[in-house]
């Protein structure tokens, strides 16, 4: 890869290729995780050394590094956000058991962050995907729609839905703005409380 990357998912950069391959499968196929017989992942040797030995991850940090858990979360949830790295999710006994079954190996023919993913169901269906350039890399850039979707996901706890759309609109019109200060002021707006109203200053300080 060359140039800066804008990764779509909150996990280690070196397994973004694996994540891209996983999403390539789950977004095209309706796979019931309970019907999966085997989930096999092949990584380059350096990436395997970093991420291929966390089938029994201990906590959030190891979950973020674990090819086993990340693939498991994508298969089960069909998404990967910070929610998948909360204890309530990565400590789910069902996900932990499945992660231990995921087969991760080093493949000598793979280089860098390239990855191969193979899924076989109990019924005999097989699905495969290969990724050489992960989504978000300069060679496989996120689309505007994907960037906007990521912003909507992570801004939801801070800004109202209308405010989020206003920010996106301001970015689209940025080159026509008299000053970037307008956008900066919008991004510094009062965060949302759990009930959807602006959170008090004291509450934000405690958070």
Which residue stretches match the model-derived regions?
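Terminal-appendage/accessory-domain detector
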Residues: 1-207
């Amino acid at each position: 890869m060359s140039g800066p990357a804008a990764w779509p998912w909150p996990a280690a950069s070196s397994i973004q290729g694996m994540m891209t391959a996983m999403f390539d499968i789950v977004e095209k196929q309706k796979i019931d995780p309970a019907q999966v017989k085997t989930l096999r992942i092949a990584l380059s040797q350096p990436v395997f050394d970093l991420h291929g030995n966390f089938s029994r991850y201990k906590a959030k940090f190891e979950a973020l590094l674990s090819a086993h858990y990340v693939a498991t979360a994508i298969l089960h949830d069909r998404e990967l956000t910070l929610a998948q790295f909360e204890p309530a999710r990565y400590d789910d006994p069902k996900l932990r058991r499945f992660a231990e079954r995921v087969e991760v190996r080093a493949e000598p023919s793979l280089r860098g962050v390239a990855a191969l993913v193979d899924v076989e169901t109990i019924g005999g269906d097989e699905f495969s995907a290969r990724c050489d350039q992960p989504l978000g890399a300069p060679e496989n850039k996120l689309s505007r729609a994907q960037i906007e979707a990521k912003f909507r996901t992570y801004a939801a706890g801070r800004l109202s839905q209308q405010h989020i759309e206003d920010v996106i609109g301001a970015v689209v019109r940025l080159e026509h703005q008299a000053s970037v200060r307008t956008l900066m002021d919008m991004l510094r707006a009062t965060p949302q409380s759990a009930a959807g109203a602006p959170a008090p200053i004291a509450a934000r300080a405690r958070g």
